[in-house]
Amino acid sequence: MARVTVEDCLEHVKNRFELVMVATKRARQIAVRGDQPMVEWENDKPTVVALREIAEGYVTADILDED
């Protein structure tokens, strides 16, 4: 399991504050709504999965406009 760094995530969002908002929303979608992760689960917590999805470019700030 590779570590997720803030720098990896910041390539896909504007700043660290937006990163927190995007990661929080995506983690809740996975944990509460039961959405399927876009990356392999690897026995991680939903917050780590959300950060991995952001770092790999699967999730962007556009998620904030949903719902």
Curated annotation (Swiss-Prot):
The UniProt keywords, alphabetically, are: DNA-directed RNA polymerase, Nucleotidyltransferase, Transcription, Transferase
> Which Gene3D superfamilies does this entry report, sorted A to Z?
3.90.940.10
Q: Entry's InterPro entries?
A: DNA-dir_RNA_pol_omega, Pol_omega/Rpo6/RPB6, RPB6/omega-like_sf
Gene Ontology terms: cellular component: DNA-directed RNA polymerase complex
Q: Which GO terms describe its molecular function?
A: DNA binding; DNA-directed RNA polymerase activity
Q: Which EC class, in a word?
A: transferase
Catalysed reaction equations from the record:
RNA(n) + a ribonucleoside 5'-triphosphate = RNA(n+1) + diphosphate
Subunit structure, interactors included: The RNAP catalytic core consists of 2 alpha, 1 beta, 1 beta' and 1 omega subunit. When a sigma factor is associated with the core the holoenzyme is formed, which can initiate transcription.
Q: Which family does it belong to?
A: Belongs to the RNA polymerase subunit omega family.
- Name the job this protein performs: Promotes RNA polymerase assembly. Latches the N- and C-terminal regions of the beta' subunit thereby facilitating its interaction with the beta and alpha subunits.
Q: What is this protein called?
A: DNA-directed RNA polymerase subunit omega
Q: Which organism is it from?
A: Legionella pneumophila (strain Corby)
Highest classification ranks of the organism: Bacteria, Pseudomonadati, Pseudomonadota, Gammaproteobacteria, Legionellales
